[in-house]
Each structure stands twice: as C-alpha cells, then as structure tokens.
Amino acid sequence: WAVVLKFVSDFEAAFKGTPNQFAADAYDCVYVIKEAAEKAELTPDMSVSDMSDALKKAMTEIKVDRMTGKSITWSEDGEPTKDPTVVIVQGGVYKILHAE
C-alpha cells in the first residue's frame, strides 16, 4: 500500500495533478521491463533481436507484485494474468477496494 501512496505523492508533486489508471500502468510497466531485463541478463553487446527474444522469454518466467496487481504473469502470447488492485478515492482519501 505504501508504494501506491508514494506513487500518488510523487506524481502529484511532479505533474501537479492526480494520476490516472494509465499513469499507474505505465509506472508498473517500467519496473516489469526492468525485472524481465535483469532475468534475461541483457548485455550491451547483444543485438536488438537477441535482446527482444531474451525479454520475450523472460516475461514468461517472471511473476511480479506491482502497484496495479499481484501475482502478475504473462503467457507466451504476451497476455497478462493478475489479481488486480483496485484503488478508489473517497473524500480525497485513497483506499484499496477489497473483494467481498
């Protein structure tokens, strides 16, 4: 939960506005790509094609917990599966919406 609050605070400070779902997805995406790149052990001497192949393979081998969801995995076709995190704003306060 702390990561969500920090993201919102940092976003508001940097952009003078409230982040939307696309901002949260983009934020998570950067860190997912970072994790896949580390898993793939990318090196500067690799060709772009080899990097792409290694990243694609690594994406099917990682399982991540990020701000927008938990236990996120990807199929060989690139389709994600996750337990989504839903955040609502009530009275200016961010709250995680839990399933009942």
Regions flagged by a language model, labelled:
Residues W1-E100:
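Extracytosolic ligand-binding ectodomains
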